[in-house]
From Swiss-Prot:
Segments forming domain Protein kinase: 442-705
InterPro entries linked to this entry: Kinase-like_dom_sf (IPR011009), Prot_kinase_dom (IPR000719), Protein_kinase_ATP_BS (IPR017441), Ser-Thr/Tyr_kinase_cat_dom (IPR001245), Ser/Thr_kinase_AS (IPR008271), U-box_ubiquitin_ligases (IPR051348), Ubox_domain (IPR003613), Znf_RING/FYVE/PHD (IPR013083)
Name of the protein this chain belongs to: U-box domain-containing protein 34
UniProt gene name: PUB34
Catalytic activity annotation: L-seryl-[protein] + ATP = O-phospho-L-seryl-[protein] + ADP + H(+); L-threonyl-[protein] + ATP = O-phospho-L-threonyl-[protein] + ADP + H(+); S-ubiquitinyl-[E2 ubiquitin-conjugating enzyme]-L-cysteine + [acceptor protein]-L-lysine = [E2 ubiquitin-conjugating enzyme]-L-cysteine + N(6)-ubiquitinyl-[acceptor protein]-L-lysine
Record family assignment: Belongs to the protein kinase superfamily. Ser/Thr protein kinase family.
Lineage: Eukaryota, Viridiplantae, Streptophyta, Embryophyta, Tracheophyta
Length: 801
């Protein structure tokens, strides 16, 4: 872009044009070290040189340096010996955070490098006689420069915008007089335009940055200058040959220009350093005024020296003022920095204190809420504790009342027991020491029976064989059972009921008469090597048990029901007389229900499975005929030697089919079939499902059983006279009936002990007196079985007789 002025420029930092002269300004651009410059700038300069230079009195080239707001950081900045800055990739540091000396040195180096931009354009102006350099400070942001110049150019200027394909021109107003004008207003117009045009660079480059002169704080001129650091553009003025007057006028205006710029556009730089960097003859002093030397005309030597002295004095004075201002600025900056630090510190302390206060308030509020919750919980806990205390006190009172009642009940029971046991002379009261001594400290070898109630020990008390039953009194039910057994047995005296000899109530011990042959169950199932009972003994046992049950059922004032009648509770003495034992579960029936009425009662069942009355098990109602069901099962077991499970339907089917003999006990070979079948029918009637279908024990069962027993006794007496032992039952050596017959090598049977003693001394037969082939003995099982059967008959026949 090219601007041509026709008026005097009476201000600003550029050269002053004399009256009537043409002033040509060309804006150029280019890169540092570029030998050719920008293509557009070359076209503009070439066009201006070819078209305007012959007409112009002064020719100026302007280059705008970008605003320097930051410099490279020290760790990536290397200063070469050639004083060129080499910048690598990294962070940059704002100028206000760097020392002034570093900034000034960096500015000088950058300015020196930007002078190379004019080299290619100076070559194009070789034909010019003189050039003049001075510096302008411009900003390059904003609207385009050509448009701004076209918009604001006064009528006294001609503007040429040289583009690649066209030239845009704004001509002067033809009505304006081109003659030299001496009016101050007209001269100021051209000057104001160039000043505004120069200022437009500043405005367009940084429209939002404040002017350093607008700083309101003391000492902020240096900070604003550092923040908006800029350099004046290097400009070269190519002049035509001048007259002495023009040279003089130009020289005379230098102080005036210097004075104008001193108050407004002087950048905050160290001018002494700046003079050192600009050592060329044409450089302006302090980046504002340069020496003007006319190549055609030279002023007198004395006048030139005097002006130079005046300029130097003025520069010296300005330097002193600048140094003073810089010093004051530094002090103000230090004070400002200190004040800012204090403000920051106070602000930080205030913020911290505010945070602490807020935290304390929040903590206090939280603690209050927590305290309120804790208080509420505490009051709730206190109420719960008070309620628990009240409940505990009530429970404690109720417990004391219950303990008193229990103690009263215990004392009453104890009194009853003491009266019952202490005044009853029907049995003897033993001490625990006597029982322990008799049982040898309850030795396991003395145990003859064991059940759910406890253990039975064999002992001798008062030179009488006895059986001590030790009951476990670990539950109230067992204590009640023990007391009931004592109560019942102490009132009973019957030949077919076990006799109670004495008791030790404190330790739960009962002393019974001792029955040598054990229980009926051992004979039915042949346990403990018990021999099978003959049929007539079985008939008699059934009759004796019926008599004992009839005695219990007819007791006064209330009938007694055994409730646990079974073969294990029927004991046999040495003469095979049966007695009913274990009356512990016996019950005194106060309200006997009729047999033809089914009643349901809430009672605890007692007894053994398969022997419990089905109706009693179903309804809970106990009757005397409940024992009759167990009695019928015992009859069928004595006939068949089978388990009670399913025995009733099996015998019933056998009787109906006539196959009863197949179910009878095989250990007995001489069953009377007629009497046996009649006895089986009685057992089936007693084992009916309903009580109303069972016969009466005393009026219907006992008479039939008595008749059968009498028939059996008569038959046994007839057979007893013919019971003599055969001769082969006797041992040839001992002449006695043999117990363990053994066959020797001679074919004869001997008693084992006798033949072994004979063979130790002899090797011949005791009968034939001949030598024996060997000494081996063979057991004669057939003969031993026959001998045992004969002995049993003889023994039971003697019992019957």
């Amino acid at each position: 872009m090219v601007v041509m002025l026709t008026q005097e420029m009476s201000g600003g930092g550029g050269p002053k044009a004399e009256e009537g002269q043409l002033f040509v300004a060309v804006a150029v651009k280019g890169l540092i070290g570029d030998k050719l410059g920008g293509a557009g700038s070359r076209r503009a300069v070439r066009w201006a040189v070819d078209n305007l230079l012959p007409k112009a009195d002064k020719f100026v080239m302007i280059h705008v340096i970008p605003t320097i707001t930051s410099i490279p950081t020290p760790n990536i900045l290397i200063l070469m010996f050639t004083r060129m800055w080499v910048v690598t990739a990294g962070d940059r540091l704002p100028v206000e955070e760097v020392e002034e000396s570093v900034v000034e040195m960096y500015v000088r180096d950058v300015k020196k490098e930007y002078e190379t931009v004019f080299v290619p354009f100076l070559k194009m102006c070789k034909s010019t006689r003189s050039t003049k350099r001075y510096f302008r400070s411009r900003r390059t942001k904003g609207t385009g420069v050509p448009l701004t110049v076209l918009r604001y150019a006064p009528e006294t200027c001609e503007v040429y915008i040289v583009c690649k394909d066209r030239i845009t021109t704004k001509s002067m107003d033809p009505l304006i007089n081109r003659e030299p004008c001496t009016s101050p207003h007209a001269a100021a117009t051209a000057h104001d335009f160039l000043r505004d045009w120069a200022a437009s660079f500043h405005t367009l480059r940084s429209p939002t940055l404040p002017d350093p002169r607008q700083s309101t704080e003391a000492g902020t001129r240096r900070s604003a200058s550092a923040r908006e650091l800029r350099f004046e553009a290097l400009s070269l003025t190519c002049n035509k040959p001048k007259t002495p007057q023009s040279s003089k006028a130009s020289s005379a205006t230098t102080p005036e220009i210097f004075r104008r710029r001193r108050g407004s556009d002087i950048p905050q730089l160290n001018y002494s350093d700046f003079d050192k960097t600009c050592t060329k003859p044409q450089s302006n002093v302090e980046n504002i005024v340069s020496e003007h030397r006319d190549s055609d005309r030279s002023p007198p030597e004395t006048s030139r020296k005097s002006k130079k002295v005046e300029i130097e004095e003025e520069v010296e004075r300005l330097k002193n003022e600048l140094q003073s201002t810089v010093f004051k600025y530094k002090q103000a900056c230090e004070e400002l920095f200190s004040t800012q630090n204090k403000v920051k510190m106070l602000s930080t302390e205030y913020l911290n204190e505010s945070k602490r206060v807020n935290n304390a308030v929040e903590k206090e509020e939280l603690q209050r809420n927590t305290a309120a919750l804790e208080k509420e919980r505490y009051m709730k806990a206190v109420k719960e504790v008070e309620t628990a205390k009240a409940l505990l006190a009530r429970e404690f009172c109720q417990r004391q009342i219950a303990e008193v009642n229990a103690l009263r009940t215990y004392l009453e029971k104890k009194k009853v027991i003491d009266q019952l046991l202490g005044t009853d002379h029907r049995y003897r009261k033993y001490t625990i020491e006597e029982i322990v001594t008799a049982t040898e400290g309850f030795s396991p070898e003395k145990v003859i029976g064991e059940g759910g109630y406890g253990k039975v020990y064999q002992c001798s008390l008062d030179s009488t064989p006895a059986a001590v039953k030790v009951v476990r009194l670990d539950t109230p039910e067992k204590k009640q059972e023990f007391l009931k057994e004592v109560e019942v047995l102490s009132q009973l005296r019957h030949p077919h009921v076990v006799l109670l000899l004495g008791a030790c109530p404190e330790n739960g011990c009962l002393v019974y008469e001792y029955l040598e042959n054990g229980s009926l169950e051992e004979y039915i199932f042949h346990r403990k090597n018990k021999p099978p009972l003959p049929w007539f003994i079985r008939f008699r046992v059934i009759f004796e048990v019926a008599c004992g049950l009839a005695f219990l059922h007819s007791s006064k004032p209330e009938p007694i029901v055994h409730r646990d009648l079974k073969p294990g509770n029927i004991l046999l003495n040495r003469n095979y007389v049966s007695k009913i034992a274990d009356v512990g579960l016996a019950k005194l029936v106060t309200d006997v229900a009729p047999d033809n009425v089914t009643m349901y009662r809430n009672s605890v069942l007692a007894g053994t499975l398969h022997y419990i009355d089905p109706e009693y098990h179903r309804t809970g109602t106990i009757r005397p005929k409940s024992d009759l069901y167990a009695f019928g099962i015992i009859i069928l077991q004595l006939l068949t030697a089978r388990n009670p499970s399913g025995i009733v339907p099996a015998v019933e089917n056998a009787v109906k089919k006539g196959t009863l003999t197949e179910m009878l006990d095989k250990s007995v070979t001489d069953w009377p079939l007629a009497e046996t079948e009649e006895l089986a029918r009685i057992g089936l009637k007693c084992a009916e499902f309903r009580c109303r279908d069972r016969p009466d024990l005393k009026s219907e069962v006992i008479p039939v059983l008595k008749r059968l027993v009498e028939t059996a006794n008569s038959k046994v007496k007839k057979e007893g006279s013919n019971l003599r032992a055969p001769s082969h039952y006797f041992c040839p050596i001992l002449r006695e009936i043999m117990e363990e017959p053994e066959i020797a090598a001679d074919g004869f049977t001997y008693e084992r002990k006798a033949i072994l003693a004979w063979l130790e001394k002899h090797n011949i037969s005791p009968v034939t007196r001949q030598k024996l082939d060997h000494f081996k003995l063979t057991p004669n099982h057939t003969l031993r079985s026959a001998i045992r059967d004969w002995k049993s008959r003889v023994r039971f026949s003697n019992v019957v007789v």
